[in-house]
């Protein structure tokens, strides 16, 4: 297996899983920050503007500037350049950018039920369950919009998008 992508719901232990995966395989980690930095270098668009493409809400000026579309195009280019190398773990939103026509990619999704994620978020951030649930709802909306924009699919955790869907709360 040359490339492993890991996409995760928030508070599903993605960082720990990816860290262990990289340590065990010796593969190079490519993060969203790496892809954003490369896309910024390729395009001349500042990193914070490119990073906004991961948010469900586009800029109010997007109709005029097409900033979201330009940022996404450069992120796709950065991902395409990254996958030329072998033995990669691509974690985060960027893993969804790897072409579906590449057959040596293992696509993994990490997810847990909302109750477990809320409890983990509340403990980690020292906030109420209600505040944690609001944060998770917002982050899930961002992930759902990302998957909708790329694949016209409404469920970011849909099994047909991945080779493996692993529950992290079991």
Where are these regions (language model features)?
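Residue-level preference for the first positions of well-ordered beta-strands
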Residues: 3-5, 87-89
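Glycine-rich phosphate-binding P-loop
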Residues: 5-22
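ATP-dependent small-molecule kinase phosphotransfer cores
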Residues: 34-87, 94
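Conserved nucleotide-binding/hydrolysis micro-motifs of P-loop NTPases
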Residues: 95-96, 112-117, 170
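Short loop/helix-cap segments at secondary-structure boundaries that form the rim of catalytic
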Residues: 97-103, 157-159
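Conserved phosphate-donor/acceptor-positioning beta-strand/loop module used by diverse small-molecule
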Residues: 101-124, 129-139
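Small-molecule kinase domains that catalyze NTP-dependent phosphoryl transfer to phosphate-bearing small molecules
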Residues: 129-170
